[in-house]
A protein has these predicted regions:
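Extended, highly charged clamp/arch subdomains and adjacent linkers
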Residues: 1-139, 158, 181-185
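Single-stranded RNA-binding regions, centering on S1/OB-family and related RNA-binding modules
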Residues: 371-372, 376-540
Length: 540
């Protein structure tokens, strides 16, 4: 088996009389590659082509070598009358039974490894996408593009609440440019819109051109950004969306979702099946159970890493907080509906919303902003409040000083080892407390690159070889990365063009959401595609 694995080739052929209309599998019509060197994405592509009936797939290797090997093992006397029968039996049993079994095993192992790799890539991309920095303190206008049915507009405030809904018809067949322009400008003036979020679906580029022209006549500075709307339509038609906006059409809910994706990606994306978000590679070709487990873990990890505002968090995001059950989430929302808000973390246990055990597990991930206790807005666990108070008192500070320059300076000058003994706390917990006191409102997403805002349109015809551009990494796959440079289709940077040093996988250098400087390597106008390089002055 090992010998076959190390010395065989995967050979693919296009089946006769089969139509591959879009030529998806063109590179595999007459293709061969050593099994041991075959990349995961090619294994999964070949598997899909075979499953769809386009490709025939086989393993080719020296079977005569295998027969000879087995003959030497099994035939002790070449001159025996039985030798010929044994040789025939070896060939027959290998062709009918042993060979196909070994080949299936090898392909199964290849597939399993490739699926694990695809799931790992998807999980990493998803985590980086979920941790996209939120667009804080901005009034946002969401735009769900369309032709015949019109573009749906939704205004949301700083907290994500929907303020207004409109429909405009700037494109075919109505072409009501002036009427649509007036509606957009009126919304900008009325709500002091800062940013317009445009979905990247049908009519996206036409809508971008329309908005770029409109904002030139706005009375205030307005930018726009193209937002990945993958999965937005799924959410908009879901039970959850209907419960939240029962009187709105699907497309209107979609416009709200697009705006919220820009404002707080994590809170909005948790409402959608992770597989619909579109940052994976061959996710439909892997075992669903394994994929779901990996993605659920990533979502839970991301939510708990960021934390939630207990007074605004939806049930969709609360369900990922460690320790919370469906029943406890219902109690939290019921309390908010009856009393308006929580004023402290303690109210969760004082009102018997959470048991002592669940409270201990979950409370460190839940925040109360503008509450009665300033520590409730930090990631400090209530069980460490007494030690935190001692620390503050020992340096002459109090809760009112959280995040101030004076407190930061004093905390920078303390001896960690000495203070851990003085207030009887381990060094790691003390360091976490100090970091939280320095930045009580810290959001780990702020460490990531901010989305690129635009004010004008870029067309593929504008691109020239060697041109320097700024782009956002939208997807990372085994063979490279797709980068949004502001044209209709994302540009592709091949793994060989990412860096001038050797890397095994693009994820060693790039992550979804990264803002990168890239260079146009080649433009394919007929296909609407662009090849990019991250290597300056790349002459390869």
């Amino acid at each position: 088996r090992n010998d076959i694995y190390n010395n065989s080739k995967i050979v693919t052929k296009k089946k006769k009389n089969v139509v591959d209309e879009k030529k998806v599998y063109e590179m595999y019509y007459d293709y061969s590659e050593d099994v041991k060197y075959m990349k995961p994405h090619r294994v999964l592509a070949v598997n899909r082509g075979e499953k769809e009936g386009v490709l025939s797939v086989s393993l080719e290797y020296n079977k005569e070598y295998i027969y000879n090997y087995l003959e030497k093992k099994l035939i002790k006397d070449e001159n025996s009358e039985c030798a010929t029968y044994v040789k025939d039996a070896i060939v027959d049993s290998y062709k009918r039974l042993i060979g196909p079994s070994v080949e299936r095993e090898i392909r199964s192992e290849l597939t399993e490894k490739s699926e694990e790799g695809a799931i790992e890539v998807f999980a990493k991309n998803l985590e980086n996408y979920l941790l996209t920095p939120p667009m804080k303190d901005k009034m946002i206008l969401g735009l769900d593009p369309a032709y015949r049915t019109g573009c749906k507009l939704a205004v949301i405030d700083y907290t994500g609440q929907m303020l207004d809904i409109k429909v405009i018809y700037p494109h075919e067949p109505k072409n009501d440019f002036e009427g649509s322009k007036k509606i957009v400008l009126d919304l900008i003036d009325k709500y002091n819109i800062d940013v317009i979020a445009i979905g990247n679906g049908t009519a996206s580029r036409e809508s971008e051109t329309f908005i770029a022209n409109v904002i030139k006549d706005a009375k205030r500075s307005v930018s726009y950004i193209i937002v990945n709307e993958a999965g937005a339509s799924v959410y908009s038609a879901s039970k959850l969306a209907i419960e939240e906006f029962p009187n709105l059409h699907v497309e209107e809910r979609s416009a709200i979702s697009i705006a919220r994706r820009l404002q707080d990606p994590l809170s909005e994306l948790v409402k959608i099946d992770s597989k619909s978000i579109g940052v994976g590679q061959y996710q439909h070709d892997v075992k669903e159970k394994n994929l779901n487990e990996a993605l659920d873990f990533v979502v839970s990890k991301s939510v708990n890493n960021v934390g939630v505002n207990i007074n605004t968090a939806s049930a969709s995001i609360l369900k990922y907080i460690s320790g919370l059950t469906k029943k406890s989430i219902e109690k939290i929302i019921d309390f908010r509906n009856k009393h308006g808000r929580f004023n402290s973390r303690n109210e969760l246990i004082d009102n018997k919303i959470l048991s002592a055990k669940v409270y201990e597990q979950s409370i460190g991930f839940m925040r109360v902003l503008d509450g009665s206790n300033p520590l409730d807005k930090t990631s400090i666990h209530p069980e460490s409040y007494d030690k935190t108070t001692k620390l503050l008192e020992s340096i002459g500070m109090n809760y009112d000083s959280l995040g101030t320059e004076e407190l930061v300076k004093k905390l920078d000058n303390i001896d960690i080892d000495d203070y851990s003994k003085k207030i009887d706390i381990d060094i790691y917990t003390l360091e976490d407390i100090i970091n939280s006191l320095k930045k009580p409102n810290r959001d780990p997403r702020d460490d990531f690159d901010k989305p690129i805002l635009k004010s004008d349109v870029l067309h593929i015809e504008d691109l020239k070889k060697g041109m320097e551009l700024e782009g956002t990494v939208r997807n990372v796959v085994d063979f490279g990365a797709f980068i949004d440079i502001g044209i209709k289709n994302d540009g592709l940077v091949h793994i060989s063009k990412i860096t001038d040093r050797y890397i095994k996988h693009p994820s060693e250098v790039l992550s979804v959401g990264d803002i990168v400087t890239c260079y146009v390597d080649e433009v394919f106008l007929d296909k609407g595609k662009v090849a990019l390089s991250l290597i300056k002055n790349d002459e390869k």
